[in-house]
UniProtKB/Swiss-Prot annotation:
Belongs to the WRKY group II-c family. InterPro entries: WRKY_dom, WRKY_dom_sf, WRKY_plant. Transcription factor. Interacts specifically with the W box (5'-(T)TGAC[CT]-3'), a frequently occurring elicitor-responsive cis-acting element. Residues 149-159 have a biased composition (Acidic residues). SUPFAM superfamilies: WRKY DNA-binding domain (SSF118290). The keyword Cell inner membrane does not apply. Its main location: nucleus. One of its GO terms (biological process) is regulation of lignin biosynthetic process. This is Probable WRKY transcription factor 13. It is found in: Nucleus. Pfam families: WRKY.
Length: 304
């Protein structure tokens, strides 16, 4: 009974010592007398004179330890004494385990950040030309092999064909894109061709005025004072007489005429003029030339 009372009083002393409410002390010291008569094992374990058990333990660590193990001090005093003897090792192991867990979490977070950073750096861009197009000037990008890739600021028209594609082996295939000079040339050619087509259409639409004359004559070509050159002939339906086409022989004169016979009355000659003459008739020129030739005979006559 004396040993049990001594153990209970010892438990009371230790409980007063490790009271977590007392915050005036920076640390807690636990000492056990060497003449304890609880048991032979306890006397052998406490044979050394009063030794320090837990020097300068933190207040938060001790509170957490007492909060996690409250029932051991109430129900089993002997177990609480053994627990008090092993208190430094338990606290140190708990602190080391919490520190290792924090370090492990830190390493995991660091590895996660490194992994996400490497994945984001290795992930290919869906549209590598978008930044250069918005910035308005050319830039250069490096691929995984270290070679530079020049980016043109007019690649917005590449669409599906432009850009860099990665295959399964990680090699880059560069698609040929038209340069700015080629695009400018094609655009200029397109503009020129469209202008030419417009001019041709306007020429086709504009027609010279036509004048038609009907005369009774046995000769197809009538003498109208101008010189003509025949350039075509066409067979007309329902008549045996073909249609003839003539052009004025004067330089820069675009007047044409068409001569044909009337289908109902072949004696009638229909002459159609297209355009107007900008010069005097050729007969007057011939008359002038003849008059000058009579007044001034050619030089060849003097050599005979």
């Amino acid at each position: 009974m004396g040993a049990i009372n001594q153990g209970i009083s010892l438990f009371d002393e230790s409980q007063t010592v490790i009271n977590p409410i007392n915050t005036n002390h920076l640390g807690f010291f636990f000492s056990f007398p060497s003449h304890s008569t609880l048991s032979s094992s306890s006397s052998s374990s406490s044979s050394s004179p009063s030794s320090l058990v837990s020097p300068f333990l933190g207040h938060n660590s001790l509170n957490s330890f007492l909060h996690n193990n409250p029932s051991s001090f109430i129900s089993h005093p002997q177990d609480s004494i053994n627990l008090m003897t092993n208190l430094p090792e338990t606290l140190i192991s708990s602190l080391s385990s919490s520190k290792q867990r924090d370090d492990h979490d830190g390493f995991l977070n660091l590895d996660h950040h490194r992994l996400t950073g490497s994945i984001s750096s290795q992930r290919p861009l869906s549209n590598p030309w978008a930044w250069s197009c918005q910035a308005g000037y050319g830039s250069s990008q490096k691929n995984n092999h270290g070679s530079e890739i020049d980016v043109d600021d007019n690649d917005d028209e590449v669409g599906d064909g432009g850009g860099i594609n990665d295959d399964d082996n990680g090699r880059h295939h560069h698609h040929d894109t038209p340069s700015r000079h080629d695009k400018h040339n094609t655009a200029s050619l397109g503009v020129v061709s469209s202008l030419k087509m417009k001019k041709l259409k306007t020429r086709r639409k504009v027609r010279e005025p036509r004048f038609c004359f009907k005369t009774l004559s046995e000769v197809d070509v009538l003498d109208d004072g101008y010189r003509w050159r025949k350039y075509g002939q066409k067979v007309v339906k329902n008549t045996q007489h073909p249609r003839s086409y003539y052009r004025c022989t004067q330089d820069k004169c675009r007047v044409k005429k068409r001569v044909e016979r009337l289908a109902d009355d072949p004696r009638m000659v229909i002459t159609t003029y297209e355009g107007r003459h900008l010069h005097s008739p050729s007969n007057h020129l011939d008359d002038d030339s003849l008059s000058t030739s009579h007044l001034h005979p050619p030089l060849s006559n003097f050599f005979w």
